[in-house]
Every structure is written in structure tokens, then in C-alpha cells.
């Protein structure tokens, strides 16, 4: 059985986080249908530190048994370090996930999400800060790269491993692709072969036959 930082994952399918989609009700339904785990919608670390009420509501954990992760996004290591224990305290989550893959304009224009794949040293500092501050495993969600001219998923995955991340989740598209076209599973294979932590594949999963990449 695969484990994330010592946490057994009771299955091969984990519901990926998506803002505006994977809310509490949707996660609960997917859990009841067999998902081994689920991750919250992405939560602003800055808003969590400021104790925003709407942000806190995103942290609510579904009652169905299974792994639960809270996904944080931000660009300041100190803010991430302050938000990590708050997220754990308010949600009772099993692990924290760092968003370094969101492609939406308002996020990347602020230097967050997939923009961090253009500043790998900063990404590494954010991961290190989260790992140090959290008392649960930390994972990292990333993409293939910014565009096909700057593919850096393997490099960022190695940095994540070096800084103490327990697993990485790789979306096989670049930021330039957004959600169009098919995900590149070859880059996910490359990441899997490059690091000795669990690698979760994400993107273009349309049937149960597509759930494992070797």
C-alpha cells in the first residue's frame, strides 16, 4: 500500500482539488463512491492568517472516512509557515498540500500558483517553511512547467523531495495549456523515476484503466 509521510493511502484514486468544484458536498459524494482521499479547494494562506471567515469555511472536513488534505497557496514562506498550523488546527487535516500549479491569471499575476515554477528557489523556500511549521506531512501540487520551453517538473519535484515533501502531485500540462489538450503522462513518468517519494498523476484521467502510471 502506498503511504504519504507514513499515512496509508487506502486506494489508488484521490480526488484532486479544484476551486469552485471540490467543495464539502462534492468531496463527500466522491468519498462515498470510493475515493481514497480528497483535498480541499485551494485556500489562501494570507487570508487564513488574517482569519477570514469565508476562508475558514473552506476547511471543513467531510464526515466520510478517508485521507483529507488542505491545499494552501501563497508566495511568502513566512505567511505559509504561519498558515500551516492554523490550517491543521481548524480542519483536522491529515496532510497539507502546496499549490504550485494553479494556472489562472489572477493567481499567477500575484506570483502564486504556477508562477512559482518560474522561481524554483522561492518554491523551495516555501516548501521548507511549510515542512518545518507543519506537524503533518506536506505534499506539493505542480505542473509540467510554465510552457513547453520551460519544462521543470522533474527539477521542482527533486527540490520538493530535498526540502522534505512527502509526495508530489504532477499535472501533466503546462501553464500555457491551462486545461486544454491531453496531459503529458511521459513527464509524470520522468518525475516518478527521478524521486523516491510517491508521485500522484493528475490530468486526463477518464476511466479506471488510466489510474496507474508505471
Enumerate the predicted regions with their spans:
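Flavin-dependent oxidoreductase catalytic cores
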Residues: 1-214
Amino acid at each position: 500500500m502506498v503511504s504519504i509521510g507514513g499515512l496509508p493511502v487506502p486506494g489508488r484514486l484521490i480526488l484532486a482539488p479544484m476551486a469552485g468544484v471540490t467543495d464539502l458536498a462534492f468531496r463527500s459524494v466522491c468519498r462515498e463512491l470510493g475515493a481514497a482521499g480528497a483535498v480541499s479547494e485551494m485556500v489562501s494562506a494570507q487570508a487564513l492568517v488574517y482569519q477570514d471567515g469565508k476562508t475558514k469555511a473552506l476547511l471543513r472536513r467531510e464526515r466520510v472516512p478517508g485521507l483529507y488534505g488542505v491545499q494552501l497557496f501563497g508566495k511568502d514562506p513566512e505567511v505559509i509557515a504561519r498558515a500551516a498550523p492554523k490550517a491543521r488546527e481548524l480542519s483536522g487535516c491529515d496532510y497539507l498540500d502546496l499549490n504550485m500549479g494553479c494556472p489562472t491569471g489572477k493567481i499567477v499575476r500575484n506570483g502564486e500558483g504556477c508562477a512559482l515554477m518560474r522561481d524554483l528557489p522561492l518554491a523551495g523556500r516555501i516548501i521548507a517553511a511549510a515542512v518545518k511549521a507543519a506537524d503533518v506531512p506536506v505534499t506539493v501540487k505542480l505542473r509540467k512547467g510554465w510552457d513547453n520551453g520551460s519544462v521543470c517538473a522533474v527539477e521542482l519535484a527533486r527540490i520538493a523531495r530535498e526540502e522534505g515533501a512527502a509526495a508530489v502531485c504532477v499535472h501533466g500540462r503546462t501553464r500555457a495549456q491551462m486545461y486544454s489538450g491531453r496531459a503529458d503522462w511521459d513527464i509524470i513518468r520522468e518525475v516518478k523515476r527521478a524521486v523516491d517519494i510517491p508521485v500522484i498523476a493528475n490530468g486526463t484521467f477518464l476511466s479506471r484503466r488510466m489510474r496507474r502510471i508505471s
